[in-house]
Amino acid sequence: MTRLLLGAAMLALLAGCSTVKQPELDVAVQSSGQIWNAVAHYSGRTFLSGPRWTGTQGPQLTAIDQNGQRAAYPSGAWNSWAPGRDAANVFVNINALRLEGDKLWVVDTGSPEFGGNPVSQGAKLVCIDLRTNQVVRTYFFGPDIAIAGSYVDDVRFSAGKAFLTDAGNAGIIVVDLETGAARRVLDQHTSVVARPDRDLILSNQVVKAPDGQPLRVNADPLEVSIDGVWLYYGALQGPWFKVRIQDLTNPALPPEQLAARVEFFADIPATGGSVMDAQGNLYFSDLAHDAMRVRRPDGQIDTLIVDERLHWVDAPFLDKDGTLWLPTPQMDRVALFNKGKSLVQWPVAVYRLSTQR
Protein backbone atom coordinates (compact mmCIF):
# COMPACT_ATOMS: atom_id res chain seq x y z
CA MET A 1 0.00 0.00 0.00
CA THR A 2 2.84 2.37 0.88
CA ARG A 3 4.48 1.74 -2.49
CA LEU A 4 1.19 2.49 -4.26
CA LEU A 5 0.82 5.76 -2.38
CA LEU A 6 4.42 6.76 -3.15
CA GLY A 7 3.92 5.88 -6.80
CA ALA A 8 0.76 7.95 -6.98
CA ALA A 9 2.51 10.88 -5.33
CA MET A 10 5.40 10.68 -7.80
CA LEU A 11 3.02 10.59 -10.76
CA ALA A 12 1.20 13.62 -9.40
CA LEU A 13 4.51 15.46 -9.00
CA LEU A 14 5.58 14.63 -12.53
CA ALA A 15 2.21 15.67 -13.88
CA GLY A 16 2.53 18.98 -12.07
CA CYS A 17 6.01 19.55 -13.48
CA SER A 18 4.88 18.84 -17.00
CA THR A 19 2.46 21.75 -16.93
CA VAL A 20 5.26 24.29 -16.40
CA LYS A 21 6.21 25.40 -19.88
CA GLN A 22 9.41 27.21 -20.65
CA PRO A 23 9.08 30.40 -22.66
CA GLU A 24 9.85 29.95 -26.33
CA LEU A 25 13.05 31.05 -28.00
CA ASP A 26 12.73 32.92 -31.27
CA VAL A 27 15.69 33.28 -33.64
CA ALA A 28 16.17 36.98 -34.35
CA VAL A 29 19.24 36.71 -36.59
CA GLN A 30 21.93 34.14 -37.23
CA SER A 31 25.33 33.88 -38.83
CA SER A 32 27.21 31.06 -40.52
CA GLY A 33 30.55 32.80 -40.50
CA GLN A 34 30.92 35.41 -37.77
CA ILE A 35 30.62 35.24 -34.01
CA TRP A 36 28.46 37.99 -32.51
CA ASN A 37 28.77 38.75 -28.81
CA ALA A 38 26.65 41.88 -28.30
CA VAL A 39 23.40 43.19 -29.71
CA ALA A 40 21.18 46.28 -29.65
CA HIS A 41 17.89 46.95 -31.41
CA TYR A 42 16.59 50.37 -32.38
CA SER A 43 13.77 51.46 -34.67
CA GLY A 44 13.71 48.26 -36.69
CA ARG A 45 17.49 47.94 -36.98
CA THR A 46 19.63 45.37 -35.21
CA PHE A 47 23.25 46.13 -34.33
CA LEU A 48 25.77 43.38 -33.65
CA SER A 49 29.43 43.31 -32.67
CA GLY A 50 31.89 40.62 -33.68
CA PRO A 51 35.12 40.66 -31.65
CA ARG A 52 38.24 40.21 -33.74
CA TRP A 53 40.04 37.85 -31.35
CA THR A 54 37.52 35.05 -31.95
CA GLY A 55 39.16 34.48 -35.31
CA THR A 56 36.01 34.91 -37.40
CA GLN A 57 35.72 37.36 -40.26
CA GLY A 58 33.36 40.29 -40.78
CA PRO A 59 32.75 43.88 -39.66
CA GLN A 60 33.39 44.76 -36.06
CA LEU A 61 29.95 46.39 -36.05
CA THR A 62 27.12 45.24 -38.31
CA ALA A 63 23.70 46.81 -38.84
CA ILE A 64 20.81 44.70 -40.14
CA ASP A 65 17.78 46.56 -41.47
CA GLN A 66 14.14 45.47 -41.50
CA ASN A 67 14.68 43.72 -44.84
CA GLY A 68 17.55 41.67 -43.50
CA GLN A 69 20.21 43.62 -45.38
CA ARG A 70 23.55 43.71 -43.58
CA ALA A 71 26.14 46.48 -43.71
CA ALA A 72 29.23 47.58 -41.82
CA TYR A 73 28.21 50.34 -39.40
CA PRO A 74 28.43 53.30 -39.25
CA SER A 75 30.61 52.93 -42.36
CA GLY A 76 33.05 50.62 -44.02
CA ALA A 77 35.85 52.97 -43.04
CA TRP A 78 35.13 52.51 -39.34
CA ASN A 79 35.46 48.76 -39.85
CA SER A 80 38.65 48.80 -41.90
CA TRP A 81 41.38 48.56 -39.26
CA ALA A 82 44.51 46.55 -40.09
CA PRO A 83 47.70 46.02 -38.07
CA GLY A 84 49.92 49.08 -38.18
CA ARG A 85 47.11 51.41 -39.16
CA ASP A 86 46.06 54.46 -37.14
CA ALA A 87 43.31 53.30 -34.79
CA ALA A 88 41.73 56.66 -33.89
CA ASN A 89 38.77 56.44 -36.27
CA VAL A 90 38.38 52.70 -36.69
CA PHE A 91 37.19 49.83 -34.53
CA VAL A 92 39.97 47.49 -33.45
CA ASN A 93 38.08 44.99 -31.30
CA ILE A 94 34.55 45.72 -30.09
CA ASN A 95 33.47 43.99 -26.92
CA ALA A 96 30.24 45.73 -25.90
CA LEU A 97 27.32 47.80 -27.15
CA ARG A 98 25.01 49.95 -25.04
CA LEU A 99 21.87 51.72 -26.24
CA GLU A 100 20.98 54.92 -24.40
CA GLY A 101 18.07 56.76 -26.00
CA ASP A 102 19.00 57.33 -29.64
CA LYS A 103 22.72 56.90 -29.00
CA LEU A 104 24.64 53.68 -29.54
CA TRP A 105 27.74 53.44 -27.36
CA VAL A 106 30.51 51.15 -28.53
CA VAL A 107 33.27 49.78 -26.29
CA ASP A 108 36.46 49.13 -28.24
CA THR A 109 39.05 47.22 -26.22
CA GLY A 110 41.73 48.44 -28.60
CA SER A 111 43.48 45.09 -28.38
CA PRO A 112 43.30 42.88 -31.47
CA GLU A 113 44.38 39.84 -29.47
CA PHE A 114 42.86 38.25 -26.39
CA GLY A 115 45.15 39.08 -23.48
CA GLY A 116 47.21 41.47 -25.61
CA ASN A 117 47.95 45.15 -25.08
CA PRO A 118 45.79 47.94 -26.54
CA VAL A 119 47.25 49.62 -29.62
CA SER A 120 47.70 53.40 -29.64
CA GLN A 121 44.28 55.14 -29.68
CA GLY A 122 42.65 51.74 -29.93
CA ALA A 123 40.96 51.59 -26.52
CA LYS A 124 38.00 53.94 -26.63
CA LEU A 125 34.32 54.58 -26.05
CA VAL A 126 32.54 55.66 -29.22
CA CYS A 127 29.14 57.39 -29.29
CA ILE A 128 27.06 57.08 -32.48
CA ASP A 129 23.89 59.08 -33.13
CA LEU A 130 21.44 56.57 -34.60
CA ARG A 131 19.34 59.34 -36.14
CA THR A 132 22.21 60.59 -38.30
CA ASN A 133 24.41 57.46 -38.33
CA GLN A 134 27.37 59.65 -37.40
CA VAL A 135 29.98 59.29 -34.69
CA VAL A 136 29.40 62.28 -32.44
CA ARG A 137 32.17 61.77 -29.89
CA THR A 138 35.03 59.45 -29.08
CA TYR A 139 36.55 59.07 -25.62
CA PHE A 140 40.09 57.74 -25.86
CA PHE A 141 41.75 55.77 -23.08
CA GLY A 142 45.47 56.48 -23.13
CA PRO A 143 48.20 54.23 -21.70
CA ASP A 144 47.56 55.62 -18.23
CA ILE A 145 43.95 54.37 -18.36
CA ALA A 146 44.00 51.38 -20.72
CA ILE A 147 47.27 50.13 -19.31
CA ALA A 148 49.32 47.12 -20.39
CA GLY A 149 47.12 44.04 -20.26
CA SER A 150 43.87 46.03 -20.13
CA TYR A 151 40.72 44.66 -21.74
CA VAL A 152 38.08 47.38 -21.52
CA ASP A 153 35.00 45.24 -21.28
CA ASP A 154 31.57 46.81 -20.72
CA VAL A 155 29.93 50.13 -19.87
CA ARG A 156 27.05 51.66 -17.93
CA PHE A 157 26.05 55.29 -17.40
CA SER A 158 24.78 57.47 -14.57
CA ALA A 159 24.75 61.18 -13.72
CA GLY A 160 26.95 62.30 -16.59
CA LYS A 161 29.53 59.60 -16.02
CA ALA A 162 30.44 56.38 -17.80
CA PHE A 163 31.65 53.38 -15.83
CA LEU A 164 33.65 50.68 -17.58
CA THR A 165 35.09 47.42 -16.32
CA ASP A 166 38.63 46.34 -17.13
CA ALA A 167 38.58 42.56 -17.43
CA GLY A 168 42.30 42.32 -18.17
CA ASN A 169 44.22 44.54 -15.78
CA ALA A 170 41.52 44.50 -13.13
CA GLY A 171 39.85 47.77 -12.26
CA ILE A 172 37.06 50.20 -13.06
CA ILE A 173 37.34 53.22 -15.35
CA VAL A 174 35.29 56.34 -14.59
CA VAL A 175 34.74 58.83 -17.41
CA ASP A 176 33.33 62.35 -17.17
CA LEU A 177 31.21 62.54 -20.31
CA GLU A 178 31.38 66.33 -20.47
CA THR A 179 35.12 66.85 -20.10
CA GLY A 180 36.29 63.46 -21.32
CA ALA A 181 38.55 63.07 -18.30
CA ALA A 182 39.02 59.47 -17.21
CA ARG A 183 40.57 57.83 -14.19
CA ARG A 184 41.04 54.33 -12.83
CA VAL A 185 39.64 53.23 -9.48
CA LEU A 186 39.73 50.05 -7.39
CA ASP A 187 42.80 48.78 -9.24
CA GLN A 188 43.46 45.13 -8.27
CA HIS A 189 40.90 45.33 -5.47
CA THR A 190 39.51 41.94 -4.42
CA SER A 191 36.11 42.92 -5.82
CA VAL A 192 37.44 43.25 -9.38
CA VAL A 193 39.92 40.36 -9.45
CA ALA A 194 38.76 36.88 -10.48
CA ARG A 195 38.91 34.46 -7.58
CA PRO A 196 41.14 31.38 -7.92
CA ASP A 197 38.50 29.13 -6.35
CA ARG A 198 35.79 29.86 -8.95
CA ASP A 199 36.44 28.07 -12.22
CA LEU A 200 34.55 28.90 -15.39
CA ILE A 201 32.68 25.72 -16.32
CA LEU A 202 30.64 25.02 -19.44
CA SER A 203 29.48 21.61 -20.68
CA ASN A 204 30.88 20.23 -17.42
CA GLN A 205 34.40 21.23 -18.41
CA VAL A 206 36.70 23.90 -17.03
CA VAL A 207 37.42 26.53 -19.69
CA LYS A 208 41.16 26.92 -20.06
CA ALA A 209 43.25 29.80 -21.38
CA PRO A 210 45.77 29.24 -24.18
CA ASP A 211 48.47 28.53 -21.57
CA GLY A 212 46.46 25.58 -20.27
CA GLN A 213 45.50 27.23 -17.00
CA PRO A 214 41.87 27.75 -15.96
CA LEU A 215 40.56 30.92 -17.62
CA ARG A 216 40.21 33.85 -15.24
CA VAL A 217 38.31 36.97 -16.32
CA ASN A 218 38.48 39.99 -14.03
CA ALA A 219 35.90 42.81 -13.70
CA ASP A 220 33.33 42.17 -16.41
CA PRO A 221 29.56 42.59 -15.79
CA LEU A 222 28.20 45.75 -14.20
CA GLU A 223 24.90 47.54 -13.65
CA VAL A 224 23.68 50.79 -12.11
CA SER A 225 20.90 50.52 -9.52
CA ILE A 226 17.58 52.00 -10.65
CA ASP A 227 17.89 54.82 -8.11
CA GLY A 228 21.38 55.67 -9.38
CA VAL A 229 22.95 55.17 -5.97
CA TRP A 230 24.98 52.00 -6.51
CA LEU A 231 27.26 50.47 -9.09
CA TYR A 232 26.98 46.69 -9.05
CA TYR A 233 29.88 44.75 -10.58
CA GLY A 234 32.02 41.66 -10.36
CA ALA A 235 34.46 39.34 -12.08
CA LEU A 236 32.95 37.14 -14.78
CA GLN A 237 32.91 34.16 -12.40
CA GLY A 238 31.29 36.20 -9.62
CA PRO A 239 30.42 37.08 -6.96
CA TRP A 240 29.20 40.66 -7.35
CA PHE A 241 29.94 43.68 -5.20
CA LYS A 242 28.56 47.19 -4.93
CA VAL A 243 29.90 50.66 -4.22
CA ARG A 244 28.17 54.01 -4.02
CA ILE A 245 28.46 56.03 -7.21
CA GLN A 246 29.03 59.22 -5.22
CA ASP A 247 32.15 57.58 -3.79
CA LEU A 248 33.34 56.28 -7.16
CA THR A 249 33.03 59.73 -8.69
CA ASN A 250 34.75 61.58 -5.84
CA PRO A 251 38.39 62.09 -6.91
CA ALA A 252 39.20 63.52 -3.48
CA LEU A 253 38.39 60.21 -1.78
CA PRO A 254 41.66 58.35 -1.09
CA PRO A 255 41.90 54.91 -2.75
CA GLU A 256 42.06 53.09 0.57
CA GLN A 257 38.86 54.78 1.76
CA LEU A 258 37.07 53.93 -1.48
CA ALA A 259 38.19 50.32 -1.14
CA ALA A 260 36.84 50.21 2.41
CA ARG A 261 33.39 51.26 1.19
CA VAL A 262 32.96 48.35 -1.21
CA GLU A 263 30.20 45.99 -0.08
CA PHE A 264 29.10 42.49 -1.05
CA PHE A 265 26.06 42.50 -3.36
CA ALA A 266 25.09 39.01 -4.55
CA ASP A 267 26.51 35.57 -5.23
CA ILE A 268 25.85 35.68 -8.97
CA PRO A 269 27.39 32.68 -10.78
CA ALA A 270 29.64 32.91 -13.82
CA THR A 271 27.81 35.03 -16.37
CA GLY A 272 28.46 36.25 -19.87
CA GLY A 273 26.47 39.42 -19.28
CA SER A 274 23.49 41.08 -17.69
CA VAL A 275 20.80 43.70 -18.13
CA MET A 276 18.56 45.42 -15.58
CA ASP A 277 14.99 46.60 -16.19
CA ALA A 278 13.29 49.70 -14.80
CA GLN A 279 11.94 47.72 -11.84
CA GLY A 280 15.37 46.56 -10.74
CA ASN A 281 15.11 43.00 -12.03
CA LEU A 282 18.62 41.82 -12.94
CA TYR A 283 18.63 39.41 -15.87
CA PHE A 284 21.82 37.39 -16.34
CA SER A 285 23.07 34.32 -18.14
CA ASP A 286 24.16 31.33 -16.07
CA LEU A 287 26.99 29.97 -18.20
CA ALA A 288 27.41 26.64 -16.46
CA HIS A 289 23.79 25.65 -17.08
CA ASP A 290 22.92 27.24 -20.46
CA ALA A 291 20.31 29.24 -18.57
CA MET A 292 18.84 32.70 -18.21
CA ARG A 293 17.97 33.74 -14.69
CA VAL A 294 16.68 36.87 -13.01
CA ARG A 295 17.53 38.31 -9.61
CA ARG A 296 14.52 40.11 -8.18
CA PRO A 297 14.90 43.31 -6.13
CA ASP A 298 14.31 41.28 -2.95
CA GLY A 299 17.24 39.00 -3.77
CA GLN A 300 15.23 36.02 -5.00
CA ILE A 301 16.67 34.35 -8.10
CA ASP A 302 14.24 32.82 -10.60
CA THR A 303 14.95 30.76 -13.69
CA LEU A 304 13.55 32.04 -16.98
CA ILE A 305 14.77 29.24 -19.22
CA VAL A 306 17.28 26.42 -19.47
CA ASP A 307 18.11 25.50 -23.06
CA GLU A 308 21.25 24.03 -24.63
CA ARG A 309 20.92 26.54 -27.47
CA LEU A 310 21.73 29.29 -24.97
CA HIS A 311 25.38 28.32 -24.80
CA TRP A 312 27.35 31.26 -23.45
CA VAL A 313 24.84 34.07 -23.72
CA ASP A 314 27.23 37.00 -23.63
CA ALA A 315 25.53 40.40 -23.45
CA PRO A 316 21.73 40.40 -23.16
CA PHE A 317 19.77 43.36 -24.48
CA LEU A 318 16.29 44.26 -23.21
CA ASP A 319 14.07 46.13 -25.65
CA LYS A 320 11.19 48.48 -24.82
CA ASP A 321 8.67 45.64 -25.24
CA GLY A 322 10.27 43.55 -22.51
CA THR A 323 11.95 41.13 -24.88
CA LEU A 324 15.45 39.87 -24.16
CA TRP A 325 17.82 39.61 -27.12
CA LEU A 326 20.36 36.90 -26.40
CA PRO A 327 23.57 36.58 -28.45
CA THR A 328 25.16 33.13 -28.12
CA PRO A 329 28.79 33.42 -29.26
CA GLN A 330 29.88 30.06 -27.76
CA MET A 331 33.09 31.71 -26.57
CA ASP A 332 34.38 28.57 -24.86
CA ARG A 333 34.28 26.76 -28.21
CA VAL A 334 36.47 29.17 -30.18
CA ALA A 335 39.87 27.93 -31.34
CA LEU A 336 41.74 30.09 -28.82
CA PHE A 337 40.47 27.98 -25.92
CA ASN A 338 40.68 24.61 -27.69
CA LYS A 339 44.31 24.25 -28.76
CA GLY A 340 43.72 25.99 -32.07
CA LYS A 341 40.68 23.97 -33.14
CA SER A 342 37.29 25.67 -33.34
CA LEU A 343 34.40 23.71 -31.83
CA VAL A 344 31.80 26.37 -32.63
CA GLN A 345 28.48 24.90 -33.74
CA TRP A 346 27.19 26.94 -36.66
CA PRO A 347 25.07 28.89 -37.24
CA VAL A 348 25.61 31.26 -34.33
CA ALA A 349 22.28 32.81 -33.37
CA VAL A 350 20.81 35.73 -31.50
CA TYR A 351 17.61 34.61 -29.80
CA ARG A 352 14.64 36.55 -28.48
CA LEU A 353 12.95 35.67 -25.21
CA SER A 354 9.93 37.41 -23.74
CA THR A 355 10.12 38.37 -20.07
CA GLN A 356 6.34 38.74 -19.92
CA ARG A 357 4.58 35.79 -18.29
Task: Cite the ranges covered by each PLM segment.
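Beta-rich, blade/repeat-based domains predominating
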Residues: 32-43, 85-101, 107, 144-161, ...
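Conserved beta-strand positions in repeat-built beta-propeller and related beta-rich domains
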Residues: 48-55, 106-110, 164-168, 225, ...
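Beta-propeller domains
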Residues: 48-80, 115-117, 129-131
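Beta-propeller fold detector
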Residues: 70-79, 136-140, 183-198, 250-265, ...
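Short loop/turn segments immediately following beta-strands, especially the blade-tip
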Residues: 131, 177-182, 189-191, 243-254, ...
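Loop/turn-rich, solvent-exposed surfaces of beta-rich toroidal or solenoidal domains
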Residues: 225-245, 259-301, 307, 313-314
